[in-house]
Amino acid sequence: MEMKDYIFTSESVSEGHPDKVADQVSDSILDAILAQDPRARVACETLVTTGMAVIAGEITTSAVVDYPKVVRETIREIGYNDSAMGFDWETCAVLVSIDKQSPDISQGVTEGEGMFKEQGAGDQGLMFGYACTETPELMPMSITYAHKLTQKLAEVRKNGVLDFLRPDSKSQVSVEYVDDKPVRVDTVVISSQHTPEVSYEAIKEGIIEEVVKKIIPAHLMDERTRMLINPTGRFVVGGPMGDCGLTGRKIIVDSYGGHGAHGGGAFSGKDPSKVDRSAAYMGRYVAKNLVAAGLCEKCEVQVAYAIGVAEPVSVMVDTAGTGKISSKRIAEIVREVFDLRPRAIIEQLDLLRPIYRKTAAYGHFGRELPEFTWERTDKVYMIRQKAGI
């Protein structure tokens, strides 16, 4: 028997978390390049540690970009503006080591080159998309609230409501399910970096009143809901001084918070010829449209590619038993409605734009911003027609 009553937990981290600082630096560099050269090939990795940021990778572009300036601007916007934090946009060292993309890879993803003349996938690999009916955004409830909590922490820090907060923070939300439906929030964990002089009581009260109660709806909390705020008691040393940060270390935060599967490829710092990013966005677009069309309540889509080959080697749909029609027929509809070749994905989702910095904190999915084209539900009518519902 499948487990129907359970508690499921997801976490999020704020824009000031060291791994997220690295993601945002990588995507800020990608955006700066795409703004000048939309066809650039970018694979940019970032490391941040006490007093230092390192960027390295393979970039082939005609764009002229002041990389250290982009790095510093990003760190400043996040809020590391004081060397007392161990990381400061003005004084940190910035090291740059950039090479060009390998010509062996380039010929596989450049139209008219390689064994297959069409633009092929930038690498082999498997990517997943997911959607469900738990929230209006068609995302799992636990990750939705976890992201909203870390966003709210950043907001009250920047607007001065809780001026003792510093940029590094994390949240975790545990949701109780009864008969496979989310019914209440069981536990909320928040850890936020803060100034040395503030009392624990002020931190706890401020975060509960100005963050938790403003985000988690009252009907989802009860007297049994636990709130664990800075449970170590002190969090002064944080950010890149507390932990070394690296691009691509928060792939579950970036996607579905542990719901569904993950192919293992990170998103940030990669231009859309890399299917790790573009096909994962397409997977979300497909899954969300299938759920929005009413074909299923939960949907996981897997696509897989071979390097240099345009057509996916496989497409799989799993509705966890919630499908109105067979998963086999849904997979056929996916191939009929959506073009899953890399160039077509880039065109359908308009991915050659400098839109990626926004994706690099608070989740790539479930945020209905105008730039997030993969969140549109504009294929619902066509899907319903083909499904005959």
From Swiss-Prot:
Gene3D superfamilies, per database record: 3.30.300.10
Matching PROSITE patterns: ADOMET_SYNTHASE_1, ADOMET_SYNTHASE_2
Gene Ontology cellular-component terms listed: cytoplasm
Coiled coil ranges: none
Keyword set, alphabetical order: ATP-binding, Cytoplasm, Magnesium, Metal-binding, Nucleotide-binding, One-carbon metabolism, Potassium, Transferase
Gene Ontology annotations of biological process type: one-carbon metabolic process; S-adenosylmethionine biosynthetic process
Residue segments, region Flexible loop: 101-111
Positions with a binding annotation for L-methionine: E58, Q101, D243, K274
E.C. no: 2.5.1.6
Cofactor remark from the record: Binds 2 divalent ions per subunit.
Reactions that this protein is recorded to catalyse: L-methionine + ATP + H2O = S-adenosyl-L-methionine + phosphate + diphosphate
Record-linked InterPro entries: ADOMET_SYNTHASE_CS, S-AdoMet_synt_C, S-AdoMet_synt_central, S-AdoMet_synt_N, S-AdoMet_synthetase, S-AdoMet_synthetase_sfam
Binding positions for Mg(2+) per the UniProt entry: D19
A GO term, aspect molecular function: magnesium ion binding
Summary of the function given for this chain in its UniProt record: Catalyzes the formation of S-adenosylmethionine (AdoMet) from methionine and ATP. The overall synthetic reaction is composed of two sequential steps, AdoMet formation and the subsequent tripolyphosphate hydrolysis which occurs prior to release of AdoMet from the enzyme.
Family designation: Belongs to the AdoMet synthase family.
Protein name: S-adenosylmethionine synthase
Species for this entry: Geobacter metallireducens (strain ATCC 53774 / DSM 7210 / GS-15)
